[in-house]
UniProtKB/Swiss-Prot annotation:
The gene is leuD. Heterodimer of LeuC and LeuD. Belongs to the LeuD family. LeuD type 1 subfamily. It is an enzyme of class 4 (lyase). GO terms for cellular component: 3-isopropylmalate dehydratase complex. GO terms for biological process: L-leucine biosynthetic process. The lineage of its organism: Bacteria, Pseudomonadati, Pseudomonadota, Gammaproteobacteria, Oceanospirillales. Keywords: Amino-acid biosynthesis, Branched-chain amino acid biosynthesis, Leucine biosynthesis, Lyase. Catalyzes the isomerization between 2-isopropylmalate and 3-isopropylmalate, via the formation of 2-isopropylmaleate. Pfam families: Aconitase_C (PF00694). Pathway: Amino-acid biosynthesis; L-leucine biosynthesis; L-leucine from 3-methyl-2-oxobutanoate: step 2/4. InterPro entries: 3-IsopropMal_deHydase_ssu, Aconitase/3IPM_dehydase_swvl, AconitaseA/IPMdHydase_ssu_swvl, IPMI_Swivel, LeuD. It comes from Alcanivorax borkumensis (strain ATCC 700651 / DSM 11573 / NCIMB 13689 / SK2). This is 3-isopropylmalate dehydratase small subunit. Its EC number is 4.2.1.33.
Length: 214
């Protein structure tokens, strides 16, 4: 998993509350269990005016020019600003996969659905909770000024706007450690490889009958 220490990125404002995982990545695109390849169909039903299906050439589809991610000011955005209860609905892990494959590194919202919030950390996507007032203030400036950028300092736990005071955010220390060091569940396990091998050797010595050939 890629380390997340500090990130400066363009902000895209998705001014919708209660965005569910089926809106993030529709169900017809969930046939793959790879973590990549979902970005082209992120928010598919909002980005396009026609119905999408797996394997389709998106270049030939009808684009919804009114949707924020299709607008020139937000091309290349890596920080998503949105409203409360983002990621509600089913527990599909494909939702953070799609957001990351599209290029997002962090999401800022007043609240997240619990399962989606946990899945983000497991995959290296940083979900940041700010107050309703701070999120509203960011919406005002981001929506009025194209190309607005924000710096996220994970170590200092701050969202740093182009103008104004830094906004502190809370994060669990263990999750922060994992993101700073690029550790997912597999990486955490591999960090303990020597201890695991030592334990297995001690088990063979203590309980040889368990490992005897039958």
């Amino acid at each position: 998993m890629e380390k997340f220490v500090r990130h400066d990125g363009l902000v895209a404002p998705l001014d919708r509350a209660n965005v569910d995982t089926d809106q993030i990545i529709p169900k017809q695109f969930l046939k793959s269990i790879k973590r990549t390849g979902f970005g082209p169909n992120l928010f598919d039903e909002w980005r396009y005016l026609d119905e999408g299906f797996p394997g389709q050439d998106n270049a030939a589809r009808l684009v919804n020019n009114d949707f924020v991610l299709n607008q020139p000011d937000y091309q290349g955005a890596s920080i998503l600003l949105t409203r409360r209860n983002f990621g509600c609905g089913s527990s599909r892990e494909h939702a953070p996969w799609a957001l990351m494959d599209f290029g997002f590194k962090a999401i800022i919202a007043p609240s997240f659905a619990d399962i989606f919030y946990n899945n983000c950390f497991k995959n290296g996507l940083l979900p940041i909770v700010l107050s309703e007032d701070n999120v509203e203030a960011l919406f005002q400036v981001v929506s009025s000024k194209g190309g607005y950028r924000i710096t996220i300092d994970l170590e200092g736990q701050q969202v740093i706007p182009e103008s104004g005071e830094p906004l502190p955010f809370e994060i669990d220390e263990f999750r922060k450690h994992c993101l700073l060091n690029g550790l997912d569940e597999i990486g955490l396990t591999l960090n303990e490889a020597d201890a695991i091998r030592a334990y297995e050797r001690s088990r063979i010595e203590r309980e040889p009958w368990v490992f005897a050939d039958h």
